[in-house]
Amino acid sequence: MPKKPINIDEKILVSIIAGSVSDKEIYEKVEKVLIDNNINYDLQIISAHRNPEQLDDYVKNSTSLIYIAVAGLSAALPGVIASKTKKPVIGVPVSAKLGGLDALLSIVQMPPGVPVASVGIDRGENAAYLAIRILDLLK
């Protein structure tokens, strides 16, 4: 269920991609901060495991400057996105199982050349604040 960006006349600056609607509580934290700061964004629910072709197409065609990937369990989503783009990717581990430690470790243990920034477990708001800081560098 993609949401409309804040202002459809402006370029989408941040793409929020969640692996599942079960991550809603976390990606809504991201949305709130972006809305409060007037940052144009897009929200997609795309699983790296169940919808790899859809994810490929989305990343390939996206004009976003930054990706925020919200994922739990094996949390492959941020790394898969990072492998397909040179744009910054911020991973948000979700505390689905093992308190989110499994997701956190999946996000931070990436191979060389596939960088993913990570915020704390369930800290969607910090991912949004980090994205805003990155965008501020472009001003």
Predicted regions and their residues:
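C-terminal binding/interaction regions
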Residues: 3-7, 18-25, 29, 99-139
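Glycine-rich phosphate/diphosphate-binding loop of Rossmann-like nucleotide-binding domains
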Residues: 11-48
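Short, ordered loop/turn segments at secondary-structure junctions
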Residues: 21, 46-48, 72-73, 94-97, ...
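Short, solvent-exposed amphipathic alpha-helical segments in soluble enzyme
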Residues: 29-36, 83-86, 133-135
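Glycine/charged-rich beta-loop-alpha catalytic/anionic-binding loops adjacent to active sites
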Residues: 39-40, 64, 86-87, 109-116
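N-terminal beta-loop-helix "entrance" segment that forms/cooperates
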Residues: 43-63
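Glycine-rich phosphate-binding loop
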Residues: 56-93
